[in-house]
Amino acid sequence: MKHIAIAGLGVVGGGVAEILLKNAALLEKNAGEKIVLKAIYTRTPKKDGPFAPYFVSDFSAIEQDPEIDLVVETIGGSTVALDFVSRALKAGKHVVTANKQLIAEHGLELFALAKANGVNILFEASVAGGIPVLNPLTRCLGANEITEVSGILNGTTNYILTQMLENGESYADALSNAQRLGYAEADPTADVEGIDAARKSCILSGLAFGKNVSPEDIHVEGISKVDALDAAFAESGGMKIKLLGRTLLQNGKRFCFVSPHFIKASALLAGVNGVFNAVCVRASEVGEVLFAGPGAGRYPTASAVVGDIIDIVKNPGRVQPAGWDACNEAPASFSQFH
């Protein structure tokens, strides 16, 4: 029996808790061992509801509980989350997180902590939500030399661009509709300026090429300057506009960047519309492989988190090589890319 604690009961954390409770029999079958929810840390515990028996208001209760084997971090950000994840790893507890900012900015530090304490930190849900990408990239494609990983990594921007090209909406109208439908935050800066996609691109680059990439080292350009003229040009040329996060090798140089692209309508990524995400991998033996599906949302993201939990429980004693090495060789300048 493995005991799980969740830190953070927002959209994703609540989804994880629901899945752990309602799918307990299925999870036991797939993991080969019973997985039991033991505690949920939240700053605002409620006295009623299905999660009330699990609430704790002090993370120390989780950190110091010898029965808790694994901590799920769904707080977000890189301040409190970094503190809690570091403490969990030092306490000898495995960690599963969906936090792309945490991994992109502090991955090296956390990988070293996990290794030093003989535990795992897994983060499949940090890129493309419910789409299995990181595990296939590092395991299933392990016989391949990866040459490029390109992706539509942000559903908000993909929805906006789809509305502009398919329905003739202006950027402002498409953004307003995205906010009304809950696809965009009240402050959409991290999405529309490419910051969210950049964090995910850093993770993909680290896993694909084994070298650390910091978000501040890559060229980032969002979609806020895409206008009706761009949409008309794309349509006239039989193309689509997509905000892509790309990491690739070209002429012996490694590039990593985020920017809007004109792509042919026949390209694999061209047919991925609305809030969907997709990642296209180019590899030496299999050629092009496309992973596509819901890249965000309560249950898709929670599904990926629980998948990592099962992976850890199913393989007791195996400490996986997490992430990438400490080589801080910055990617080549975007100006050199052709």
Protein language model annotation of sequence segments:
Residues 7, 73-75, 98, 105, ...:
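Structural motif
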Residues 304, 309-338:
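A conserved regulatory-domain signal marking ACT and ACT-like small-molecule sensing domains
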Residues 1-91:
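N-terminal glycine-/serine-/threonine-rich beta1-alpha1-beta2 phosphate-ribose binding loop
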